């Protein structure tokens, strides 16, 4: 195992050395010496040397304003390079890939060894695989796109340097290229100057498709096919592509006034334009490759006399002309020109698929399967995965916006105020209107700007080509009328098909009521007729954890899913659970495999639909090889969860979870909501107020500009606590509840739950991961530097709680130290701490200076502000999950 890390360590130290040379060239020897001194002090402080820890604090406190930025940037850039080395390590033959035999092969062998599973059953499970990844632009992808491109190239250099047979001159060339890339990064400003617009965010998503997924998805399918052939003697059908990508960028308007109907329309056009651009490159390759003459009578009939000489090329050139005409029309539309639709405009995937598939069948029939299964097969699979829209989008809006729109309408019509009606009256009105043949919206009505926006969005959905919008998600859904209201608004816009509408249940109360709401909906005949046996429900992870703490939230999520699965099964409805997880633990983030196997039995029958957020998109899909590895992990987990579902928890375990949930929620809310010192403590001990200055995402950090913790979005709430290393939202309440149950004499039962129930063991594993990343001496330093002395006792109390929590978690898990069963992650955290610690100490110092200046009525020093932004980005890179 250590050999495995030595490759990682040597890459990290080599990149560090090059960064050091870059700093020396740019700023001179003295700055490099300063950085080196700090690094050595940090390393020895981590090893337990208290004198050096004190010296580290003093050194960083005494930096002049001119030294702040270079030091902050040095450690921040180092962490970006370490992340790049680690990303490469996860796919390099000397690293993780070496000790990680193919995950799909492993899963298939495991399934084949189960006497109760026939090969036919496994095959059917493969055929019903469905994985939809929903890319969201959370304001947590801190790293700028230009730097991401440079890091991708650094990765490519590391890969080539790993080649044993490389000639000296090639080695020198690669090292020179690495130096150039690292110098370019050093001389690039790592902090965006302007907030990205929703269109910028969408373009970031398209860049991920182009740079990674476009190649990664066909590679993943080749890998899957190879493993299935080897283990089951089964070939994937050409049209079988179990993975789809959807995006919230440009569609998610919940709390983001910058996402308007016009923006959504623009992003839909842009997405189609990008698809034509990428498919044109593919077709260009096929025009040059498919020069064959021999073809089936069917293909020759299709091309006629004109194309008989080179039938495949003839078809490809025709398709190329259609793509070019489509692209030109989309380009004009994006510029705001209104043009008639050209002959042959591509709007549906079948129009792309048919000519390509005709070529494929003909090549196979004429004994040219080797050619058919080359680039042509990859393009066919891209048509199935990306198609004409490239990525579909979800629309998301808050339930009250629909209620307010209908209220305004009913008041105008003089039939009362929809907003004040009872739930029964709302439902009666909605069902009546949904069944009515006449339109509800009056022609000359002039609604308010807010209502007009809701109606315009429905109009955009109705006009978009079918298949380009995946679902309409209703956040803060609480009642059946919330769902029916959206169906009515869509009907009024003239939508010609049943759009999937997914309620999102996200607070503790809403999760607890989710099953009742869905049961009522499924009892409405009109609704049953509309959905045709399919229902999507979204489970919110971040808001429930912010509302009730992580233990109560995760149990409420489990129970809501469990009840919904059983209700839909009984009603004969195929349920797709849509998981709104984040990258960090407080937002439901867990290693994919463990997280999926810890869900209730049957939760993946309708496939997996999950959000992939901000910075996690880059960690999981930043390179084609990593895409293959991430998709394979998901595939293995879905197959395993469906064929070897986890056991139903015992009744006594459920009772213990109920108890843990109540105790932990009370403790969590006791601090967060009821302790009068809590909000002032939070505001001063973390960079929460300063985070608002970072031009991260296009949406505001708060739903309402004033207000306490409840008005903060879940992401800044977690982001702030991650910065000061207390990681509070991801553990508060959980350990205390466990301790109480242990004191009641149930430790052996908790140990059994940890051993035999994946849901519970995953919860504990996630707590261990958080505790491994948290750091009490740093959290204490923030208090000393930034918090009013009267609030120190609260900080001490919270840190003591965490210490107690760590002990109880280790006792139940029977571990001697944190992360004992995941040494690779422990190693990775230790490697980073040496570089993250100075950034934390420096951040506390910068916050101190910035707030002092504000108190004294001075203008903030731009050097301090800039260095502060860099520490925020650097710590986010060091923690590997932001919010």
Curated annotation (Swiss-Prot):
Pfam families, per database record: PEPcase
Positions annotated as active site in the UniProt record: 138, 546
Cofactor(s) in the UniProt record: Mg(2+)
Gene Ontology biological process terms from the UniProt entry: carbon fixation; oxaloacetate metabolic process; tricarboxylic acid cycle
Transmembrane segments: none
Gene Ontology molecular function, alphabetical: magnesium ion binding; phosphoenolpyruvate carboxylase activity
Keyword Magnesium in annotation: yes
Keywords: Allosteric enzyme, Carbon dioxide fixation, Lyase, Magnesium
Enzyme Commission code(s) on record: 4.1.1.31
PROSITE patterns reported for this sequence: PEPCASE_1 (PS00781), PEPCASE_2 (PS00393)
Regulation: The enzyme has distinct binding sites for each of the allosteric effectors such as acetyl-CoA, fructose 1,6-bisphosphate, guanosine 3'-diphosphate 5'-diphosphate, long chain fatty acids, and L-aspartate.
SUPFAM superfamilies: Phosphoenolpyruvate/pyruvate domain (SSF51621)
Recorded catalytic activity of this chain's protein: oxaloacetate + phosphate = phosphoenolpyruvate + hydrogencarbonate
One Gene Ontology term, aspect cellular component: cytosol
Class of this enzyme: lyase
UniProt similarity note: Belongs to the PEPCase type 1 family.
Subunit structure comment from the entry: Homotetramer.
PANTHER family on file: PHOSPHOENOLPYRUVATE CARBOXYLASE
Function recorded in the entry: Forms oxaloacetate, a four-carbon dicarboxylic acid source for the tricarboxylic acid cycle.
Protein name, per record: Phosphoenolpyruvate carboxylase
Native organism: Escherichia coli O157:H7
